[in-house]
Amino acid sequence: MAVPKKRTSMSKKRIRKNIWKKKTYFSIVQSYSLVKSRSFSSGNEHPKPKGFSGQQTNK
């Protein structure tokens, strides 16, 4: 016969939630630093899309 599970305490929920938040924060920081290092290594702080000359023509 099926028995209901015990209820998880609020402190355990909070601890697990904080661990999850820290993991996501550090992955965001790591990916951001990777993007920064790649943009500086290519010489452009903000890389432009293909076919973009940077000059506008007046018609």
Curated annotation (Swiss-Prot):
It comes from the Eukaryota. GO terms for cellular component: chloroplast; large ribosomal subunit. It holds the Pfam family Ribosomal_L32p. GO terms for biological process: translation. It is found in: Plastid, Chloroplast. Keywords: Chloroplast, Plastid, Ribonucleoprotein, Ribosomal protein. InterPro entries: Ribosomal_bL32, Ribosomal_bL32_plant/cyanobact, Ribosomal_zn-bd. One of its GO terms (molecular function) is structural constituent of ribosome. Residues 37-59 are annotated as: Disordered. Belongs to the bacterial ribosomal protein bL32 family. HAMAP family: Ribosomal_bL32. This is Large ribosomal subunit protein bL32c. The lineage of its organism: Eukaryota, Viridiplantae, Streptophyta, Embryophyta, Tracheophyta. The gene is rpl32.
